[in-house]
Amino acid sequence: KTKKTGLVAVIIPNMLNPFFAALTDYIEDALYKKGLKTMLCCSDGIPEKEIAYLNLATQNKVNGIVALTYSDIGNFINPDIPIVVFDRFFENRNIPRVASDNYNGSMMAIEKLLELGCRHPVYIRFHSIFPGESDKRKDGYLAACKKYHITPDFLDMEDCDNFIDMMKQFNISYKTAGENI
């Protein structure tokens, strides 16, 4: 059997998104407490980079992989390396995953926003050609809009190099339009 390195590869799509940054911090801390080191890989959501990082993880004999991916990486996973994916489901593949209850989470978020006085909740979405948990978040948002008689509003993001700048611009555009989102 090949000796492992005590490394776990963590593949994320973006380091600037506050959610991914916080999640990566928690993952790294949990791995460290177990005596493992983190090999952080930022794919920028580019399938070729994700595949290259999977290959790099295999070459470095990692103990495992945690992948937050927007791509169908199922065909490129080394069956000898344990992997878990986050908020992603690959049809016809037995890949362990961690997922939230995105449908009800979205409903709860809209309810909380309305409770806090928000009159126009907007759903910000990033596109992926693969089905995933974001579809359930969208469905929860639409159900909440229907339940509370809100006209759904979507902000489509094709590419986001800087999440924080994007959110600032989004906020400015709605304030300029006189919206209380």
Can you say where each PLM-predicted feature lies in the sequence?
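Amphipathic helical "hinge" segments at domain boundaries
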Residues: K1-L56, N60-N63, D139-C145
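Conserved beta-strand positions in the central sheet of alpha/beta enzyme cores
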Residues: A9, V66, V122-Y123
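Short loop/edge segments at beta-strand edges and connector loops
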Residues: C42, T69, D156
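Flexible, active-site-proximal loop/turn residues at the rims of small-molecule/cofactor binding pockets
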Residues: N14, S71, H127
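Short, Asp-centered acidic motifs that coordinate Mg2+ and/or phosphate
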Residues: N63-I65, I181
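Short, polar loop motifs at secondary-structure junctions
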Residues: A67-I73, F86-E91
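Acidic (Asp/Glu)-rich catalytic clusters
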Residues: G74-D80
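Bacterial carbohydrate/catabolite-sensing allosteric modules
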Residues: D29-L36, E48, A52-T58, I81-V85, ...
